[in-house]
């Protein structure tokens, strides 16, 4: 390295240390999905960034979805995936696919990219995600809502400096498996662990005033402003439950929550190191 390159690198490290300080030896929960999960190159970048954070002393818990793989598996059975209000209708065949693809293939492919630092888990392990059938006007089948998060296994992994990689399947008191929304799982785990930050990766720039115009990105939202944005129709559709998970986490004592654009290279690092990415939710 030339002298000026060394100096530039040192300055970069110094700046990064300032932004990283609040998170060292703290827990960050990352909900991982969307385009950053489908694109193999971006997937590798995300895993590299998570490994880097682990090496820098940040305790990362990774919660992942796997919608495209599940839909592909359902189609191989000769069925069409069904969604109502953004939630997957999960019959017996579909929950079997969820267990095979989400808790199996998808989970282990992510663990493999973490080079010995990842440990693959699902909510059934040690009753981590105790749930019950989701009660709604529509019968979604084997879709659950969380009753309790048992953190013992997660705390054990984190204390060993490992990265828990969690697929979003829970279990009820009869041993029945349920599919659970990944944003909900990430938020509930973050609250149960007392995490400092919740990060949700999406396929969009963040919260937009005009959902067809990414230049209308809202970079920051104080949680007391959320209801007004819902009333204005700015927060609508699938963003309502996603943002509700963020506000629940913050109101439970979390420092901040980010909805970030997973299409941006190194999106997690950008959000932690003071860069502009997505929408930050916080409480005064």
UniProtKB/Swiss-Prot annotation:
InterPro entries: AceGlu_kinase-like_sf, AcgluKinase_fam, ArgB, Asp/Glu/Uridylate_kinase, Glu/AcGlu_kinase, NAGK-C. The keyword Transferase applies. CDD domains: AAK_NAGK-C. Keywords: Amino-acid biosynthesis, Arginine biosynthesis, ATP-binding, Cytoplasm, Kinase, Nucleotide-binding, Transferase. This is Acetylglutamate kinase. HAMAP family: ArgB. GO terms for molecular function: acetylglutamate kinase activity; ATP binding. Pathway: Amino-acid biosynthesis; L-arginine biosynthesis; N(2)-acetyl-L-ornithine from L-glutamate: step 2/4. Coiled coil: none annotated. It catalyses: N-acetyl-L-glutamate + ATP = N-acetyl-L-glutamyl 5-phosphate + ADP. Catalyzes the ATP-dependent phosphorylation of N-acetyl-L-glutamate. SUPFAM superfamilies: Carbamate kinase-like (SSF53633). Substrate binds at residues 66-67, 88, 179. It comes from the Bacteria. The gene is argB. Its EC number is 2.7.2.8. One of its GO terms (biological process) is L-arginine biosynthetic process. It holds the Pfam family AA_kinase. Belongs to the acetylglutamate kinase family. ArgB subfamily. The record marks 31, 242 as: Transition state stabilizer. GO terms for cellular component: cytoplasm. It is found in: Cytoplasm.
